[in-house]
Design a protein with these regions (language model features):
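Acidic (Asp/Glu)-rich catalytic clusters
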Residues: 34-37, 67, 87-98, 129-135, ...
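N-terminal binding-site loop/beta-alpha segment at the start of enzyme catalytic domains
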Residues: 19-101, 162
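Bacterial N-terminal signal peptides
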Residues: 7-16
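Beta/alpha (TIM)-barrel catalytic core signal, keyed to glycine-rich beta->alpha loops juxtaposed to Asp/Glu
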Residues: 145-348, 355-356, 361-368, 394
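Acidic-and-aromatic substrate-binding clefts and catalytic sites of carbohydrate-active enzymes
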Residues: 50-56, 74-84, 108, 115-116, ...
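Structural preference for beta-strand elements that scaffold enzyme active sites
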Residues: 32, 40-44, 71-72, 96-100, ...
Length: 405
């Protein structure tokens, strides 16, 4: 009887794990992450919200996400609080989460910074592993490569040698790159060594810049109608070569596509329509969604139960598009500011004030910022880092005018 106990226990454990996986598969659909051999949930976790809550709330939010079948998280945020909160929330369940962690994103002087300095990148990466209580991450994501010059400098660099060293040491299992530039992303896809591309994809960003879309009869039968030709090539290449795209800015960045007033297209999409649009691309493995609290997570999880009618975005797509450039998506890629101004937060509060009117609550939030728009020197350093061609100095002038400093 004693000899039967251990095998029986093992069988029961396997059955329990199988039942749990089956339950998740029933509720959540999974897709291959390119050629990595990993299966990832169709919707996944953006990490920004974990900076705004405490460890207890982080645990509650992560538990709900995991129990619902979400198994992928993008960790671009180098803020020690964010990393520590996620590490705490994953205690005992690390093996249930696939981590896409960024290499070359550090937290310096209270701001997120992009770096290609090997020592800085190494310190930032080791800090991430320590705070996550893990010895590896599944996807090592080279942080923000948006220009041809940045890509050319990356290839053959000591920084890239370090990335390959991490893979050889088993600290990362797969190599990815994040980009907002379709031409650069296509270069990355054709490099032969990139397995995952984190790319900004949504109905607005896919449109031809500044051009009218010929919505002729039958055009909606081809979901690529009206998409920038370089993006078409990128999506097709990734699909045929089994390179995964993990989608950022699914809802337009800060949910801009969900409100006709803020949408660059002038029409409102639902979250389900945005997600369905992205997942219509065979190359897309998962849509990363920013989640600030349990209510937002619950709303995102409605995707699992959404009807075909709720997912249908074709009626909205028939609207004439506007230019998607020039609108801030609060992504923080413009940082660091030489004056310490939290540019993304200033722009977020400015947009709210212009849409809703300046309220005492908005003024109080602005006043509490460590630095204000009036300190902007118009040095222009942020402009070269903004993927969306936002006129940041002009935005700062507007914020100073509205908020008074």
């Amino acid at each position: 009887m004693k000899n039967l106990y251990i095998p029986l226990l093992a069988v029961l454990c396997v059955m329990a794990i199988g039942c749990r996986q089956a339950e998740k598969k029933t509720n959540m659909n999974y897709r291959p992450l390119g050629n990595t051999g990993l299966m990832v949930s169709e919707i996944s976790i953006g990490c920004g919200g974990f900076e705004k809550i405490d460890s207890a709330a982080s645990l509650e939010m992560m538990t709900m996400a995991l129990d619902s079948g979400m198994n992928y998280i993008d960790l671009y945020d180098a803020n020690p609080k964010t990393r520590s909160n996620i590490g705490y929330a994953l205690q005992g369940r690390r093996d249930e989460m696939i981590i896409q962690g960024h290499i070359g994103c550090i937290f310096k002087d209270g701001q997120h910074c992009r770096t290609r300095d090997v020592e800085e990148a190494k310190q930032g990466f080791e800090d991430m592993l320590t705070r996550l209580n893990t010895d590896h991450i599944e996807v090592g994501m080279i942080h923000i490569t948006d220009s041809h010059e940045e890509w050319d400098e990356l290839e053959g660099s000591p920084f890239l040698d370090y990335v390959f060293q991490l893979k050889n040491e088993g600290k990362i299992q797969h190599i990815g790159v994040s980009s907002h530039n379709a031409e650069v992303a296509l270069k990355a896809a054709k490099s032969g060594w990139i397995e995952v591309i984190m790319f900004s994809l949504n109905p607005a960003f896919d449109r031809l810049r500044g051009g009218a879309i010929p919505w002729e009869k039958g055009a909606m039968d081809n979901l690529q109608a009206g998409i920038d030709p370089v993006r078409v090539e990128l999506y097709d290449y990734c699909a045929t070569h089994n390179i995964a795209i993990t989608v950022m800015k699914t809802l337009g960045g800060g949910g801009r596509l969900l409100d006709a007033k803020t949408s660059p297209l002038g029409v409102a999409y639902t979250p389900e329509q945005c997600i369905a649009y992205c997942l219509s691309k065979p190359c897309v493995s998962t849509c990363i969604l920013g989640i600030d609290n349990l209510d937002e997570l619950k709303a995102d999880l409605h995707w699992m139960h959404a009807t075909d009618e709720e997912k249908d975005y074709t009626a909205v797509r028939k609207q004439e598009p506007a230019k998607a450039d020039g609108d801030c998506t609060y992504c923080n890629h413009c940082s660091p500011c030489s004056m310490g101004i939290p540019i993304a937060k200033v722009n977020e509060l400015l947009d709210k004030a212009e849409i809703e009117g300046l309220t005492p609550e908005l003024q109080a939030q602005y006043d509490a910022l460590p630095h204000h728009a009036g300190e902007c020197t118009h040095c222009g350093a942020c402009l070269s880092r903004c993927p969306f061609e936002v006129d940041i100095p002009t935005q700062m002038d507007r914020a100073k005018e509205i908020f008074g400093k």
